[in-house]
């Protein structure tokens, strides 16, 4: 499922940045539960939140939220 791929990429990039879910949530302006839900594939963020997450992690938004399979 696309949500799972997004969640896995977000978790990986957040971890590489040395950031906790709580810290990312604080910097983006959402709850830690929201970050947890995105990482667990329960939902996708709004466009505004997606852009803020990407900006906070210093990566292009499509690196996290590209829904197409990488090897397709």
Regions found by a protein language model. Give the residues of each.
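DNA major-groove recognition helix of helix-turn-helix/homeodomain DNA-binding modules
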Residues: 48-63
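Residues in the helix-turn-helix
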Residues: 23, 34, 63
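Short, charged recognition helix plus adjacent turn
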Residues: 55, 65-72
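Short basic helix-loop element that most often maps to the first helix and adjoining turn
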Residues: 8-27
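Recognition helix of helix-turn-helix/homeodomain-like DNA-binding domains
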Residues: 29-43
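A detector for short, charged/polar N-terminal pre-domain segments
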Residues: 1-5, 69-72
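Short amphipathic helical patch at the helix-1/turn junction of helix-turn-helix
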Residues: 4, 15-16, 44
């Amino acid at each position: 499922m696309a949500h799972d791929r997004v969640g896995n990429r977000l978790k990986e990039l957040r971890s590489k940045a040395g950031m906790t879910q709580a810290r990312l949530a604080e910097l983006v302006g959402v709850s830690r539960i929201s970050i947890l839900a995105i990482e667990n594939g329960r939902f996708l963020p709004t466009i505004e939140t997606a852009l803020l997450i990407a900006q906070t992690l210093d990566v292009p938004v499509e690196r996290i939220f590209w829904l197409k399979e990488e090897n397709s």
